[in-house]
C-alpha cells in the first residue's frame, strides 16, 4: 500500500522571464516569495503549494507534482491508468497523461498536509 496526492502547482518560466513572473505570482497571492534554488514558493491554494520554477530551457507552462510516499508504486498506478513515463530522474519521474500533459511524481514535499490529505492505494 502507498499514499499519494496532488501537492504542488508549478508555474514554469525560462530564466529570461522568471523574475517578472515570480514578482507577478507573488503579487497575485499577496506574499513575499520564498526562493529555494530554481523554485520559489508563492503561497498556497487550499492545501496545494503554488511555486514558480526557473527553467533552463523550454516554454512557459504549468505543471502539477503528485507527491507520494512510494514513487515506483505511484508511477505503476498511473501507468495502469494510461499515464506514460517520459523520463526517470534522481528522486522523481516525469510523466504525461493520455493527452500529453506533463506532470511529475515526487517524494513527499508538503509534510503535514500530505499526511492529512493523501489517499491510500492498494
Label for each model-derived stretch:
Residues 1-22, 62-66, 109-122:
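N-terminal beta-strand motif that seeds the catalytic metal site of vicinal oxygen chelate
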Residues 1-4, 6-15, 42-44, 48, 53-77, 79-122, ...:
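Vicinal oxygen chelate
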Residues 1-49, 73-74, 86:
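Core segments of cupin and vicinal oxygen chelate
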Amino acid at each position: 500500500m502507498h499514499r499519494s496526492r496532488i501537492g504542488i502547482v508549478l508555474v514554469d518560466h525560462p530564466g529570461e522571464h522568471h523574475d517578472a513572473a515570480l514578482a507577478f505570482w507573488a503579487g497575485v497571492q499577496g506574499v513575499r516569495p520564498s526562493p529555494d534554488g530554481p523554485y520559489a514558493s508563492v503561497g498556497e491554494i487550499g492545501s496545494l503549494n503554488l511555486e514558480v520554477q526557473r527553467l533552463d530551457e523550454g516554454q512557459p507552462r504549468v505543471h502539477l507534482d503528485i507527491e507520494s510516499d512510494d514513487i515506483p508504486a505511484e508511477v505503476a498506478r498511473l501507468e495502469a491508468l494510461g499515464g506514460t513515463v517520459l523520463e526517470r530522474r534522481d528522486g522523481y519521474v516525469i510523466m504525461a497523461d493520455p493527452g500529453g500533459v506533463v506532470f511529475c511524481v515526487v517524494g513527499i514535499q508538503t509534510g503535514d498536509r500530505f499526511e492529512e490529505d493523501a489517499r491510500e492505494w492498494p
